[in-house]
Amino acid sequence: ITCYKTPIPITSETCAPGQNLCYTKTWCDAWCGSRGKVIELGCAATCPTVESYQDIKCCSTDDCNPHPKQKRP
């Protein structure tokens, strides 16, 4: 599977063996009001555990986790 990964530049990369999920994790930091949420993209073997202040979405098809504010190619 291929997933988009951060940091910038955001690129689509092949995940390591056993990592068959893509994820998009978002949360607010001290600059959330001016910059918006922090966004982390990557690969995972299982959907990461969510802390109370985070949102996470997992998916299992190639490049299914595009940056929410960036247009898909």
UniProtKB/Swiss-Prot annotation:
What is the annotated localization of this protein?
Answer: Secreted
- Please give the name of this protein: Alpha-elapitoxin-Nno2a
Gene Ontology MF terms in the entry: acetylcholine receptor inhibitor activity; ion channel regulator activity; toxin activity
Q: Which InterPro entries match?
A: Snake_3FTx, Snake_toxin-like_sf, Snake_toxin_con_site, Toxin_cobra-type
Keywords from the named record: Acetylcholine receptor inhibiting toxin, Disulfide bond, Ion channel impairing toxin, Neurotoxin, Postsynaptic neurotoxin, Secreted, Toxin
**A cellular component annotation (GO) from this entry:** extracellular region
Paired cysteines (S-S): C3-C22, C15-C43, C28-C32, C47-C58, C59-C64
Which superkingdom does the taxonomy of this entry point to?
A: Eukaryota
- Similarity field: Belongs to the three-finger toxin family. Long-chain subfamily. Type II alpha-neurotoxin sub-subfamily.
Q: Name one Pfam family in it.
A: Toxin_cobra-type
- What does the record say about tissue specificity? Expressed by the venom gland.
Instruction: State the function annotated in the UniProt record.
Output: Binds with high affinity to muscular (tested on Torpedo marmorata AChR, Kd=0.38 nM) and neuronal (tested on chimeric alpha-7/CHRNA7, Kd=12 nM) nicotinic acetylcholine receptor (nAChR) and inhibits acetylcholine from binding to the receptor, thereby impairing neuromuscular and neuronal transmission. The toxin also shows a very weak inhibition of GABA(A) receptors composed of alpha-1-beta-3-gamma-2 (GABRA1-GABRB3-GABRG2) subunits.
Matching entries from CDD domains are given as: TFP_snake_toxin (cd00206)
